[in-house]
Amino acid sequence: MNSIYKDDSLTLHTDLYQINMMKTYWETGVYEKKAIFEAYFRKLPFENGYAIFAGLERIVRYIEQLRFSKTDIDYLRGLGHYPEEFLAYLENFEFKGSIRSAVEGELVFANEPLVQVEGTLAECQLIETALLNIVNFQTLIATKASRVRMVSGDDPVLEFGTRRAQELDAAIWGTRAAYIGGCDATSNVRAGKMFGIPVSGTHAHALVQAYRDDYEAFKAYAESHRDCVFLVDTYDILKSGVPNAIRVAKEFGDKINFLGVRIDSGDMAYMSKKVRQQLDEAGFTKAKIYASSDLDEKTILNLKMQGAKIDVWGIGTRLITAYDQPALGCVYKLVSIEDENGVMVDTMKISNNAEKVSTPGKKQVWRITRNSDGKSEGDYIALWDERPDQLDELFMFHPVYTYINKTVKDFTARPILQPIFNNGKLVYELPKLQEIKAYKDEQIEALWDEYKRILNPEQYPVDLSQKTYDQKLASIAEIREEVRLKAEQLAKENAK
Protein backbone atom coordinates (compact mmCIF):
# COMPACT_ATOMS: atom_id res chain seq x y z
CA MET A 1 0.00 0.00 0.00
CA ASN A 2 1.42 3.38 -1.00
CA SER A 3 1.54 6.12 1.61
CA ILE A 4 2.00 9.86 1.68
CA TYR A 5 4.80 9.15 4.18
CA LYS A 6 8.04 7.80 2.73
CA ASP A 7 8.93 6.17 6.06
CA ASP A 8 5.46 4.79 6.78
CA SER A 9 5.40 1.62 8.88
CA LEU A 10 2.83 -0.83 10.20
CA THR A 11 3.77 -0.07 13.80
CA LEU A 12 0.83 2.32 14.20
CA HIS A 13 -1.49 -0.35 12.80
CA THR A 14 -2.84 -0.64 16.32
CA ASP A 15 -5.60 0.65 18.55
CA LEU A 16 -4.97 3.89 20.41
CA TYR A 17 -5.52 2.19 23.73
CA GLN A 18 -2.44 0.02 23.16
CA ILE A 19 -0.26 3.15 23.01
CA ASN A 20 -2.13 4.58 25.99
CA MET A 21 -1.52 1.42 28.03
CA MET A 22 2.15 1.47 27.05
CA LYS A 23 2.33 5.04 28.38
CA THR A 24 0.70 3.96 31.65
CA TYR A 25 3.10 1.03 32.01
CA TRP A 26 6.05 3.32 31.24
CA GLU A 27 5.03 6.05 33.68
CA THR A 28 4.44 3.56 36.51
CA GLY A 29 7.66 1.66 35.86
CA VAL A 30 6.12 -1.71 34.99
CA TYR A 31 6.67 -1.57 31.22
CA GLU A 32 9.63 -3.97 31.36
CA LYS A 33 7.88 -6.55 33.53
CA LYS A 34 7.85 -9.96 31.87
CA ALA A 35 4.44 -11.02 30.59
CA ILE A 36 2.87 -13.83 28.59
CA PHE A 37 -0.18 -13.41 26.37
CA GLU A 38 -2.05 -16.08 24.41
CA ALA A 39 -4.35 -15.65 21.41
CA TYR A 40 -7.29 -17.97 20.83
CA PHE A 41 -10.88 -17.99 19.60
CA ARG A 42 -13.86 -19.16 21.61
CA LYS A 43 -16.03 -20.69 18.89
CA LEU A 44 -15.26 -22.44 15.61
CA PRO A 45 -16.34 -20.44 12.55
CA PHE A 46 -19.23 -21.49 10.28
CA GLU A 47 -20.22 -24.14 12.87
CA ASN A 48 -17.38 -26.14 11.35
CA GLY A 49 -15.59 -29.02 13.04
CA TYR A 50 -12.15 -27.40 12.78
CA ALA A 51 -10.34 -24.26 11.62
CA ILE A 52 -7.27 -23.86 9.39
CA PHE A 53 -4.62 -21.61 10.94
CA ALA A 54 -3.24 -18.98 8.57
CA GLY A 55 -1.46 -15.65 8.82
CA LEU A 56 1.88 -16.59 10.37
CA GLU A 57 3.99 -15.36 7.45
CA ARG A 58 2.48 -11.91 7.68
CA ILE A 59 2.95 -11.86 11.45
CA VAL A 60 6.63 -12.64 10.90
CA ARG A 61 7.01 -9.83 8.35
CA TYR A 62 5.19 -7.44 10.68
CA ILE A 63 7.41 -8.25 13.67
CA GLU A 64 10.58 -8.00 11.59
CA GLN A 65 9.68 -4.42 10.60
CA LEU A 66 8.29 -3.29 13.95
CA ARG A 67 9.86 0.14 14.45
CA PHE A 68 8.37 3.56 15.10
CA SER A 69 9.35 5.77 12.18
CA LYS A 70 10.07 9.49 12.43
CA THR A 71 6.64 10.34 11.04
CA ASP A 72 5.05 7.87 13.48
CA ILE A 73 6.66 9.75 16.37
CA ASP A 74 5.75 13.11 14.85
CA TYR A 75 2.13 12.03 14.54
CA LEU A 76 1.96 10.82 18.14
CA ARG A 77 3.61 14.06 19.28
CA GLY A 78 0.92 15.98 17.42
CA LEU A 79 -1.83 14.24 19.39
CA GLY A 80 -0.60 16.09 22.46
CA HIS A 81 -1.06 13.13 24.82
CA TYR A 82 2.48 11.89 25.22
CA PRO A 83 5.55 13.45 26.92
CA GLU A 84 8.84 13.70 25.05
CA GLU A 85 10.51 11.16 27.32
CA PHE A 86 7.90 8.54 26.40
CA LEU A 87 8.22 9.38 22.71
CA ALA A 88 11.99 8.93 23.03
CA TYR A 89 11.35 5.47 24.47
CA LEU A 90 9.11 4.62 21.50
CA GLU A 91 11.66 5.98 19.05
CA ASN A 92 14.18 3.40 20.29
CA PHE A 93 11.64 0.59 20.61
CA GLU A 94 12.54 -2.87 19.28
CA PHE A 95 10.67 -6.13 19.73
CA LYS A 96 12.87 -8.41 21.83
CA GLY A 97 10.23 -10.90 22.86
CA SER A 98 9.55 -14.53 21.97
CA ILE A 99 6.65 -15.84 19.91
CA ARG A 100 5.42 -19.40 19.66
CA SER A 101 2.66 -20.28 17.25
CA ALA A 102 0.76 -22.93 15.40
CA VAL A 103 2.20 -23.21 11.91
CA GLU A 104 0.17 -22.28 8.85
CA GLY A 105 -2.03 -25.09 7.60
CA GLU A 106 -2.40 -26.52 11.12
CA LEU A 107 -5.86 -27.60 12.23
CA VAL A 108 -6.83 -25.59 15.29
CA PHE A 109 -9.82 -25.59 17.60
CA ALA A 110 -11.71 -23.37 20.00
CA ASN A 111 -10.25 -22.29 23.35
CA GLU A 112 -6.71 -23.45 22.69
CA PRO A 113 -3.71 -21.12 22.31
CA LEU A 114 -2.88 -20.38 18.67
CA VAL A 115 -0.15 -17.81 19.29
CA GLN A 116 1.80 -17.23 22.50
CA VAL A 117 3.77 -14.01 23.03
CA GLU A 118 6.34 -13.70 25.83
CA GLY A 119 8.25 -10.50 26.48
CA THR A 120 7.98 -7.19 28.27
CA LEU A 121 4.49 -6.04 29.15
CA ALA A 122 4.79 -3.08 26.79
CA GLU A 123 5.94 -4.98 23.70
CA CYS A 124 3.40 -7.76 24.19
CA GLN A 125 0.67 -5.14 24.46
CA LEU A 126 1.72 -3.22 21.34
CA ILE A 127 1.42 -6.12 18.89
CA GLU A 128 -2.02 -7.34 20.01
CA THR A 129 -4.13 -5.47 17.46
CA ALA A 130 -2.11 -6.33 14.36
CA LEU A 131 -1.67 -9.95 15.44
CA LEU A 132 -5.41 -10.44 15.94
CA ASN A 133 -6.20 -8.55 12.73
CA ILE A 134 -4.01 -10.93 10.74
CA VAL A 135 -5.03 -14.19 12.40
CA ASN A 136 -8.75 -13.39 12.53
CA PHE A 137 -9.01 -12.70 8.81
CA GLN A 138 -6.66 -15.24 7.29
CA THR A 139 -7.76 -18.15 9.50
CA LEU A 140 -11.37 -17.35 8.68
CA ILE A 141 -10.79 -17.38 4.90
CA ALA A 142 -8.63 -20.51 4.98
CA THR A 143 -11.36 -22.33 6.93
CA LYS A 144 -14.08 -21.19 4.53
CA ALA A 145 -11.99 -22.38 1.58
CA SER A 146 -11.50 -25.74 3.28
CA ARG A 147 -15.26 -26.15 3.56
CA VAL A 148 -15.62 -25.41 -0.15
CA ARG A 149 -12.90 -27.94 -0.93
CA MET A 150 -14.59 -30.53 1.27
CA VAL A 151 -17.82 -30.51 -0.76
CA SER A 152 -16.25 -30.02 -4.19
CA GLY A 153 -14.30 -33.27 -3.98
CA ASP A 154 -11.71 -33.50 -6.75
CA ASP A 155 -13.30 -30.71 -8.82
CA PRO A 156 -11.02 -27.70 -9.41
CA VAL A 157 -11.90 -24.69 -7.23
CA LEU A 158 -10.90 -21.22 -8.43
CA GLU A 159 -10.76 -18.15 -6.18
CA PHE A 160 -12.58 -15.29 -7.98
CA GLY A 161 -13.17 -12.84 -5.13
CA THR A 162 -10.76 -9.95 -5.63
CA ARG A 163 -13.31 -7.34 -6.71
CA ARG A 164 -15.57 -8.15 -3.75
CA ALA A 165 -12.87 -8.20 -1.08
CA GLN A 166 -12.68 -5.47 1.54
CA GLU A 167 -9.90 -3.54 -0.22
CA LEU A 168 -6.48 -4.42 -1.65
CA ASP A 169 -4.75 -6.09 1.31
CA ALA A 170 -7.78 -8.26 2.05
CA ALA A 171 -7.83 -9.44 -1.56
CA ILE A 172 -4.13 -10.33 -1.64
CA TRP A 173 -3.81 -12.04 1.73
CA GLY A 174 -7.30 -13.50 1.49
CA THR A 175 -6.31 -15.14 -1.78
CA ARG A 176 -3.26 -16.66 -0.12
CA ALA A 177 -5.37 -17.96 2.77
CA ALA A 178 -7.93 -19.37 0.33
CA TYR A 179 -5.17 -21.21 -1.49
CA ILE A 180 -3.93 -22.72 1.78
CA GLY A 181 -7.48 -23.76 2.61
CA GLY A 182 -8.09 -25.60 -0.63
CA CYS A 183 -8.45 -23.43 -3.74
CA ASP A 184 -6.43 -24.53 -6.77
CA ALA A 185 -5.90 -21.16 -8.48
CA THR A 186 -6.89 -17.51 -8.36
CA SER A 187 -7.95 -14.77 -10.74
CA ASN A 188 -5.78 -12.29 -8.77
CA VAL A 189 -2.69 -11.67 -10.88
CA ARG A 190 -0.79 -9.83 -8.14
CA ALA A 191 -1.34 -12.70 -5.71
CA GLY A 192 0.02 -15.02 -8.38
CA LYS A 193 3.13 -12.88 -8.68
CA MET A 194 3.65 -12.44 -4.93
CA PHE A 195 2.99 -15.98 -3.75
CA GLY A 196 3.38 -18.23 -6.79
CA ILE A 197 -0.30 -19.18 -6.79
CA PRO A 198 -1.51 -20.49 -10.19
CA VAL A 199 -3.67 -17.91 -11.97
CA SER A 200 -6.80 -18.60 -13.96
CA GLY A 201 -9.37 -16.47 -15.75
CA THR A 202 -11.90 -16.37 -18.57
CA HIS A 203 -13.55 -13.14 -19.75
CA ALA A 204 -16.41 -10.89 -18.65
CA HIS A 205 -19.82 -10.05 -20.09
CA ALA A 206 -18.32 -6.75 -21.22
CA LEU A 207 -16.33 -8.56 -23.93
CA VAL A 208 -19.50 -9.97 -25.46
CA GLN A 209 -21.31 -6.66 -25.10
CA ALA A 210 -18.40 -4.81 -26.72
CA TYR A 211 -18.82 -6.93 -29.87
CA ARG A 212 -22.61 -6.98 -29.44
CA ASP A 213 -22.70 -10.66 -30.42
CA ASP A 214 -21.62 -13.95 -28.84
CA TYR A 215 -20.06 -15.29 -32.03
CA GLU A 216 -18.01 -12.18 -32.82
CA ALA A 217 -16.83 -11.90 -29.22
CA PHE A 218 -15.82 -15.56 -28.94
CA LYS A 219 -14.07 -15.41 -32.30
CA ALA A 220 -12.12 -12.29 -31.30
CA TYR A 221 -11.09 -13.92 -28.04
CA ALA A 222 -10.02 -17.11 -29.80
CA GLU A 223 -7.87 -15.10 -32.19
CA SER A 224 -5.88 -13.67 -29.27
CA HIS A 225 -5.86 -16.59 -26.79
CA ARG A 226 -5.07 -20.25 -27.26
CA ASP A 227 -6.75 -21.46 -24.05
CA CYS A 228 -10.44 -20.56 -24.30
CA VAL A 229 -13.29 -20.69 -21.81
CA PHE A 230 -16.26 -18.77 -23.19
CA LEU A 231 -18.78 -17.00 -20.93
CA VAL A 232 -22.11 -18.06 -22.42
CA ASP A 233 -24.85 -16.32 -20.41
CA THR A 234 -24.67 -12.72 -21.66
CA TYR A 235 -27.80 -13.05 -23.83
CA ASP A 236 -29.17 -16.61 -23.94
CA ILE A 237 -27.23 -19.62 -22.73
CA LEU A 238 -28.88 -22.37 -24.76
CA LYS A 239 -29.92 -20.47 -27.90
CA SER A 240 -26.87 -18.27 -28.42
CA GLY A 241 -24.08 -18.70 -25.88
CA VAL A 242 -23.31 -22.40 -26.10
CA PRO A 243 -24.16 -22.79 -29.84
CA ASN A 244 -21.75 -19.96 -30.71
CA ALA A 245 -19.06 -21.34 -28.40
CA ILE A 246 -19.38 -24.64 -30.24
CA ARG A 247 -19.29 -22.86 -33.62
CA VAL A 248 -16.06 -21.02 -32.78
CA ALA A 249 -14.47 -24.14 -31.29
CA LYS A 250 -15.18 -26.05 -34.51
CA GLU A 251 -14.00 -23.23 -36.77
CA PHE A 252 -10.70 -22.80 -34.95
CA GLY A 253 -10.11 -26.50 -34.33
CA ASP A 254 -6.55 -27.20 -33.19
CA LYS A 255 -5.66 -23.51 -33.30
CA ILE A 256 -7.18 -23.16 -29.84
CA ASN A 257 -7.51 -25.28 -26.73
CA PHE A 258 -11.26 -25.22 -26.12
CA LEU A 259 -11.36 -25.79 -22.37
CA GLY A 260 -15.09 -25.23 -21.93
CA VAL A 261 -17.76 -22.67 -21.10
CA ARG A 262 -18.68 -20.64 -18.03
CA ILE A 263 -22.15 -20.04 -16.62
CA ASP A 264 -22.59 -17.05 -14.32
CA SER A 265 -26.38 -16.91 -13.88
CA GLY A 266 -29.62 -18.85 -14.07
CA ASP A 267 -30.57 -22.21 -12.61
CA MET A 268 -27.15 -23.82 -12.43
CA ALA A 269 -28.43 -27.37 -12.00
CA TYR A 270 -30.84 -27.23 -14.94
CA MET A 271 -28.61 -25.18 -17.22
CA SER A 272 -25.50 -27.26 -16.62
CA LYS A 273 -27.35 -30.42 -17.67
CA LYS A 274 -28.59 -28.79 -20.87
CA VAL A 275 -25.17 -27.30 -21.62
CA ARG A 276 -23.52 -30.68 -21.05
CA GLN A 277 -25.97 -32.21 -23.50
CA GLN A 278 -25.22 -29.60 -26.18
CA LEU A 279 -21.46 -29.94 -25.76
CA ASP A 280 -21.56 -33.75 -25.86
CA GLU A 281 -23.80 -33.83 -28.94
CA ALA A 282 -21.32 -31.53 -30.69
CA GLY A 283 -18.47 -33.90 -29.85
CA PHE A 284 -16.90 -31.80 -27.09
CA THR A 285 -17.21 -34.40 -24.36
CA LYS A 286 -13.99 -33.23 -22.66
CA ALA A 287 -14.99 -29.57 -22.53
CA LYS A 288 -15.58 -28.45 -18.95
CA ILE A 289 -18.48 -26.49 -17.52
CA TYR A 290 -17.35 -23.68 -15.23
CA ALA A 291 -19.80 -22.14 -12.76
CA SER A 292 -19.66 -18.89 -10.82
CA SER A 293 -22.23 -16.47 -9.29
CA ASP A 294 -22.28 -16.25 -5.48
CA LEU A 295 -21.39 -19.88 -4.93
CA ASP A 296 -20.29 -21.35 -1.60
CA GLU A 297 -20.07 -24.77 0.03
CA LYS A 298 -23.81 -24.92 0.70
CA THR A 299 -24.73 -24.08 -2.89
CA ILE A 300 -22.20 -26.57 -4.25
CA LEU A 301 -23.53 -29.28 -1.95
CA ASN A 302 -27.09 -28.66 -3.14
CA LEU A 303 -26.10 -28.50 -6.81
CA LYS A 304 -24.29 -31.82 -6.53
CA MET A 305 -27.34 -33.35 -4.85
CA GLN A 306 -29.39 -32.17 -7.85
CA GLY A 307 -27.01 -33.82 -10.30
CA ALA A 308 -25.54 -30.62 -11.74
CA LYS A 309 -23.00 -31.22 -14.50
CA ILE A 310 -20.51 -28.64 -13.27
CA ASP A 311 -16.81 -29.47 -13.47
CA VAL A 312 -15.07 -26.33 -12.17
CA TRP A 313 -16.22 -23.99 -9.41
CA GLY A 314 -15.41 -20.27 -9.35
CA ILE A 315 -15.92 -18.96 -5.81
CA GLY A 316 -15.91 -15.22 -5.21
CA THR A 317 -17.90 -13.02 -2.85
CA ARG A 318 -18.95 -15.63 -0.32
CA LEU A 319 -15.40 -16.90 0.12
CA ILE A 320 -13.25 -13.75 0.17
CA THR A 321 -15.66 -11.96 2.54
CA ALA A 322 -16.48 -15.03 4.67
CA TYR A 323 -20.02 -13.99 3.81
CA ASP A 324 -21.97 -16.03 6.36
CA GLN A 325 -19.58 -15.26 9.26
CA PRO A 326 -17.36 -12.24 8.56
CA ALA A 327 -15.54 -12.32 11.93
CA LEU A 328 -13.65 -15.04 13.80
CA GLY A 329 -13.53 -13.41 17.23
CA CYS A 330 -9.97 -14.29 18.19
CA VAL A 331 -8.93 -12.72 21.51
CA TYR A 332 -5.58 -12.04 23.21
CA LYS A 333 -5.38 -12.58 26.95
CA LEU A 334 -2.71 -12.04 29.59
CA VAL A 335 -2.02 -15.41 31.25
CA SER A 336 1.10 -14.77 33.32
CA ILE A 337 2.97 -11.71 34.63
CA GLU A 338 6.06 -10.98 36.70
CA ASP A 339 5.31 -9.90 40.28
CA GLU A 340 7.22 -7.44 42.45
CA ASN A 341 9.63 -10.22 43.46
CA GLY A 342 10.48 -11.12 39.88
CA VAL A 343 8.41 -14.32 39.99
CA MET A 344 6.03 -15.19 37.16
CA VAL A 345 2.49 -15.53 38.52
CA ASP A 346 -0.53 -16.79 36.63
CA THR A 347 -3.42 -14.46 35.88
CA MET A 348 -6.80 -14.81 34.23
CA LYS A 349 -10.02 -13.08 33.27
CA ILE A 350 -13.15 -14.38 34.96
CA SER A 351 -16.72 -13.72 33.92
CA ASN A 352 -20.29 -14.74 34.62
CA ASN A 353 -20.24 -16.04 31.04
CA ALA A 354 -18.43 -19.38 31.26
CA GLU A 355 -17.12 -19.14 27.68
CA LYS A 356 -15.32 -15.88 28.53
CA VAL A 357 -13.34 -17.29 31.45
CA SER A 358 -9.71 -17.58 30.33
CA THR A 359 -7.29 -20.32 31.36
CA PRO A 360 -4.29 -19.02 33.35
CA GLY A 361 -0.65 -19.93 32.93
CA LYS A 362 1.83 -20.53 30.14
CA LYS A 363 0.58 -23.52 28.18
CA GLN A 364 1.36 -25.88 25.33
CA VAL A 365 -1.19 -27.60 23.10
CA TRP A 366 -0.46 -31.24 22.34
CA ARG A 367 -2.07 -33.09 19.44
CA ILE A 368 -2.72 -36.65 20.56
CA THR A 369 -2.72 -39.22 17.73
CA ARG A 370 -3.08 -42.98 17.75
CA ASN A 371 0.01 -44.90 16.71
CA SER A 372 -2.13 -47.60 15.11
CA ASP A 373 -3.53 -45.41 12.31
CA GLY A 374 -2.36 -41.83 12.89
CA LYS A 375 -5.87 -40.56 13.62
CA SER A 376 -6.33 -37.69 16.08
CA GLU A 377 -7.71 -38.53 19.52
CA GLY A 378 -7.98 -34.89 20.52
CA ASP A 379 -5.96 -31.92 21.74
CA TYR A 380 -4.51 -31.77 25.24
CA ILE A 381 -3.79 -28.37 26.81
CA ALA A 382 -1.10 -28.67 29.47
CA LEU A 383 1.02 -26.30 31.52
CA TRP A 384 4.39 -25.56 29.99
CA ASP A 385 6.39 -27.87 32.26
CA GLU A 386 4.17 -30.90 31.60
CA ARG A 387 5.38 -33.56 29.14
CA PRO A 388 2.56 -35.82 27.97
CA ASP A 389 4.86 -37.06 25.20
CA GLN A 390 6.83 -38.92 27.88
CA LEU A 391 3.81 -40.77 29.32
CA ASP A 392 2.69 -44.31 28.51
CA GLU A 393 -0.97 -43.46 28.99
CA LEU A 394 -2.95 -40.24 29.11
CA PHE A 395 -6.18 -39.46 30.92
CA MET A 396 -8.27 -37.00 28.89
CA PHE A 397 -11.51 -35.39 30.07
CA HIS A 398 -13.91 -32.68 28.92
CA PRO A 399 -13.03 -29.36 30.64
CA VAL A 400 -16.70 -28.67 31.53
CA TYR A 401 -18.42 -32.07 31.52
CA THR A 402 -15.66 -33.92 33.34
CA TYR A 403 -17.57 -37.22 33.35
CA ILE A 404 -16.83 -37.42 29.61
CA ASN A 405 -13.35 -38.90 29.69
CA LYS A 406 -11.07 -41.56 28.26
CA THR A 407 -7.64 -43.05 28.79
CA VAL A 408 -5.40 -43.12 25.72
CA LYS A 409 -2.58 -45.61 25.24
CA ASP A 410 -0.09 -46.22 22.42
CA PHE A 411 -0.20 -42.61 21.29
CA THR A 412 2.03 -39.83 20.03
CA ALA A 413 1.85 -36.33 21.54
CA ARG A 414 2.95 -33.55 19.17
CA PRO A 415 3.39 -29.93 20.36
CA ILE A 416 1.35 -27.43 18.33
CA LEU A 417 3.03 -24.20 19.43
CA GLN A 418 6.39 -23.93 17.67
CA PRO A 419 9.14 -21.35 18.36
CA ILE A 420 8.99 -18.52 15.81
CA PHE A 421 10.92 -15.68 17.49
CA ASN A 422 13.34 -16.16 20.37
CA ASN A 423 14.35 -12.96 22.19
CA GLY A 424 13.55 -10.92 19.10
CA LYS A 425 15.38 -13.20 16.64
CA LEU A 426 13.53 -15.16 13.96
CA VAL A 427 14.28 -18.86 14.54
CA TYR A 428 11.63 -20.34 12.24
CA GLU A 429 12.19 -20.95 8.53
CA LEU A 430 9.06 -19.98 6.66
CA PRO A 431 7.91 -22.85 4.42
CA LYS A 432 6.90 -22.49 0.80
CA LEU A 433 3.21 -22.04 0.13
CA GLN A 434 2.93 -25.43 -1.57
CA GLU A 435 4.46 -27.05 1.51
CA ILE A 436 1.89 -25.33 3.74
CA LYS A 437 -0.92 -26.56 1.51
CA ALA A 438 0.44 -30.13 1.53
CA TYR A 439 0.81 -30.02 5.32
CA LYS A 440 -2.80 -28.90 5.68
CA ASP A 441 -3.92 -31.84 3.52
CA GLU A 442 -2.01 -34.25 5.78
CA GLN A 443 -3.69 -32.85 8.88
CA ILE A 444 -7.14 -33.09 7.29
CA GLU A 445 -6.44 -36.72 6.44
CA ALA A 446 -5.62 -37.45 10.10
CA LEU A 447 -9.00 -36.11 11.22
CA TRP A 448 -11.93 -38.46 11.63
CA ASP A 449 -14.66 -37.97 8.99
CA GLU A 450 -17.18 -37.17 11.72
CA TYR A 451 -15.28 -33.94 12.48
CA LYS A 452 -15.20 -32.96 8.80
CA ARG A 453 -18.95 -32.90 8.20
CA ILE A 454 -20.17 -29.60 6.72
CA LEU A 455 -23.40 -29.82 8.70
CA ASN A 456 -23.50 -30.69 12.42
CA PRO A 457 -19.98 -32.12 12.80
CA GLU A 458 -19.00 -34.04 15.90
CA GLN A 459 -17.18 -31.87 18.46
CA TYR A 460 -13.44 -32.47 18.45
CA PRO A 461 -12.07 -33.04 21.99
CA VAL A 462 -10.01 -30.16 23.39
CA ASP A 463 -9.15 -31.19 26.94
CA LEU A 464 -7.21 -29.70 29.84
CA SER A 465 -4.60 -31.62 31.77
CA GLN A 466 -5.55 -32.33 35.38
CA LYS A 467 -2.89 -29.87 36.53
CA THR A 468 -4.19 -27.13 34.22
CA TYR A 469 -7.79 -27.80 35.26
CA ASP A 470 -6.97 -27.72 38.98
CA GLN A 471 -4.96 -24.53 38.61
CA LYS A 472 -7.81 -22.83 36.75
CA LEU A 473 -10.32 -23.67 39.49
CA ALA A 474 -7.89 -22.58 42.21
CA SER A 475 -7.24 -19.27 40.43
CA ILE A 476 -10.97 -18.58 40.10
CA ALA A 477 -11.51 -19.24 43.80
CA GLU A 478 -8.52 -17.09 44.78
CA ILE A 479 -9.58 -14.15 42.60
CA ARG A 480 -13.18 -14.26 43.83
CA GLU A 481 -12.05 -14.29 47.45
CA GLU A 482 -9.69 -11.39 46.81
CA VAL A 483 -12.45 -9.42 45.10
CA ARG A 484 -14.82 -10.15 48.00
CA LEU A 485 -12.37 -8.90 50.60
CA LYS A 486 -11.54 -5.77 48.63
CA ALA A 487 -15.24 -5.06 48.08
CA GLU A 488 -15.89 -5.31 51.81
CA GLN A 489 -13.01 -2.94 52.54
CA LEU A 490 -14.21 -0.49 49.89
CA ALA A 491 -17.73 -0.55 51.30
CA LYS A 492 -16.37 0.29 54.77
CA GLU A 493 -14.33 3.21 53.40
CA ASN A 494 -17.28 4.57 51.42
CA ALA A 495 -19.49 4.37 54.52
CA LYS A 496 -17.23 6.72 56.49
What do the predicted segments below correspond to?
Residues 36-38, 96, 157, 331, ...:
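A residue-level signal for beta-strand positions that form part of recognition/binding surfaces
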Residues 55-58, 140, 432-436:
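Short amphipathic alpha-helical segments
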Residues 74-75, 143-147, 161, 452-459:
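Short coil/turn segments at secondary-structure boundaries
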